């Protein structure tokens, strides 16, 4: 490692700054941690933050730890650096998304019982590597809080620990606030969760596509997040945490790149690529049959931790499913897709075991090797509806087909299923994949039609733009209507990019290929807080690569911009 020398260095809170970029190291002297500016040779960890959101649509964070230190020291230092380097972003997120100083009491009771159960499991002598790595996650979370508080001044300090760290496990809180027996029937008050209360509208939370290119040249792995406009405060992150298993070897997923948000070291979209050459993503599925929720118990591992443990410990797609399905909490239920690039050779057929999916529900799940399907069809599409019949039926989708319509609830006939089935053949390279994942011509595509006034909806396409719907439109159910809901990004992985410093093609912002560019000042959504957000989301795709020239920074080059 060499020390980074900056032309202009500002000694402020132990961070070196230059042109929007910050570099800091965590050292340990006489048993005490200290953050210092720049990159130091023998540091426990160092971090790099590029505040480029108004230039590219993303901020960029990378953190690398030193394997000469213990797992606990590396985890704490990594968390501390993240909390310190992104303290401003964490605070802005708190103001917009996390006004509540604590979770609902019923959720806190669940967390307390869960923590007690986990401590007993750690003493059982089973799955020792799993539980040691589970402990490391909690240490990293503590580091985020301490790093934030080390930087916070003035109003930034008027927050609770919960508000600083809740981003990490927000989806667990999200579901628990709804499914646990009511204590006063108070719904979770955080803005991004309010429409998930009983009786609220369903929120589709992603489109995904895996596509084999012609002649088996490569396999593209892509994901679109669907969410509200205020979630477009993004950080693309890369970690190289040199944590060890009990046999002394490095964890397989010690390097991971992901799309993410301030204050968390999981993705949340979810989209990951790892040093084990795995690509991982999901789309959320709904639990319409609430009787399943009786299976949600604190004697489990929360979803945020299971996803992090799986991407760190897995060496194959099958192993990822095995790790993730352990101690199922039944929270934040998704169809997960994992592609193993170790089982792919360009211009040759996929080898068995290359592609697995896993669908989780409270009390169970169903996974399987879908390589044969992918080999035959050349694509796999995911759109918030379970594939496996047992999961589909248990979740209550057949009744929803009758209540709503097949175009919304049927795995075979969903609008996005139809569009992917029609258009996947157009994907022949990275640029054409980018175009498909940004596609939404809802005013003209017959698949986007509905029994509505006007007679179409952007929900029936690949990248939603519900912010463009008519406010006075008439729709058969709320999910199709005007609301703060849109495709907020695209991420695309490939073997070629993965093997080039865990690279990925990324874009932040709603589609503007067939629709107008999203601008806060002209949006129908009205006056939503957006401090430090880009004013206009007309960014191109960028190729983001980590660890270029050993510096653990980001290289981002635009490659596709619709003219």
Regions found by a protein language model. Give the residues of each.
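Cleavable N-terminal signal peptides of Sec/SRP-targeted secreted and luminal proteins
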Residues: 2-18
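N-terminal mature-domain region immediately after signal-peptide cleavage
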Residues: 15-319, 323-563
């Amino acid at each position: 490692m060499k020390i980074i020398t900056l032309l202009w260095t500002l000694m402020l809170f132990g961070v070196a700054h230059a042109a929007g970029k910050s570099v800091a190291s965590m050292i340990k002297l006489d048993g005490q941690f200290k953050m210092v500016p720049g990159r130091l040779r023998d540091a426990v960890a160092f971090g790099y933050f590029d505040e480029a959101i108004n230039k590219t649509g993303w901020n960029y964070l990378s953190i690398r730890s030193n394997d000469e230190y213990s797992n606990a020291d590396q985890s704490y230092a990594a968390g501390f650096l993240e909390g310190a380097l992104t303290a401003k972003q964490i605070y802005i997120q708190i103001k917009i998304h996390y006004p509540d100083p604590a979770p609902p009491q019923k959720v806190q009771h669940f967390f307390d019982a869960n923590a007690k159960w986990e401590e007993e499991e750690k003493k059982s002598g089973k799955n020792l590597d799993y539980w040691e790595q589970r402990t490391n996650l909690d240490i990293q979370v503590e580091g985020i809080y301490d790093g934030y508080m080390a930087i916070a001044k003035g109003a930034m300090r008027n927050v609770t620990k919960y508000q600083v760290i809740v981003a990490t496990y927000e989806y667990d809180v999200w579901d628990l606030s709804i499914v646990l027996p009511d204590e006063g029937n108070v719904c979770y008050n955080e803005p991004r969760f309010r429409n998930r209360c009983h009786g609220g509208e369903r929120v589709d939370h992603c489109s995904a596509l895996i596509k084999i290119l012609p002649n088996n040249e490569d396999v593209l792995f892509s994901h679109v997040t669907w969410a509200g406009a205020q979630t477009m405060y993004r950080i693309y992150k890369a970690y190289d945490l040199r944590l060890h298993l009990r046999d002394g070897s490095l964890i397989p997923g010690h390097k991971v790149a992901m799309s993410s948000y301030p204050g968390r070291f999981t993705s949340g979209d979810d989209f990951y690529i790892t040093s084990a050459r795995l690509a991982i993503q999901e789309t959320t599925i709904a639990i319409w049959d609430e009787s399943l929720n009786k299976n949600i118990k604190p004697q489990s591992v929360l979803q945020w931790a299971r996803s992090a443990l799986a991407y760190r410990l897995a060496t194959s797609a099958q192993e990822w499913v095995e790790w993730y399905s352990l101690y199922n909490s039944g929270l934040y239920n998704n169809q997960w897709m994992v592609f193993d690039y170790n089982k792919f050779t360009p211009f040759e057929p996929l080898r068995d075991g290359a592609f697995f999916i896993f669908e989780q529900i409270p009390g169970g799940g169903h996974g399987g090797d879908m390589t044969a399907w992918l080999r035959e069809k050349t694509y796999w599409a995911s759109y918030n509806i379970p594939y496996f019949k047992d999961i589909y039926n248990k979740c209550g989708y057949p009744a929803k087909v009758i209540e709503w319509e097949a175009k919304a609830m049927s795995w075979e006939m969903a609008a996005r299923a139809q569009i992917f089935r029609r258009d996947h053949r157009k994907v022949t390279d990275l640029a054409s994949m980018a175009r498909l994942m940004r596609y939404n011509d809802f005013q003209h595509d017959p698949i986007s039609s509905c029994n509505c006034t006007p007679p179409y909806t952007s929900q029936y396409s690949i990248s939603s733009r519900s912010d463009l719907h008519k406010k006075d439109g008439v729709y058969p159910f709320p999910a199709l209507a005007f609301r703060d809901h849109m495709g907020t990004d695209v991420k695309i992985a490939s073997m070629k990019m993965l093997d080039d410093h865990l690279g990925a093609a990324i874009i932040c912002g709603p589609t503007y290929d067939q629709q107008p560019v999203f601008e806060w000042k002209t949006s129908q959504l009205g006056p939503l807080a957006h401090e430090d957000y880009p004013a206009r989301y007309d960014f191109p795709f960028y190729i983001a690569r980590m660890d270029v020239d050993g510096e653990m920074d980001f290289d981002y080059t635009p490659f596709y911009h619709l003219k």
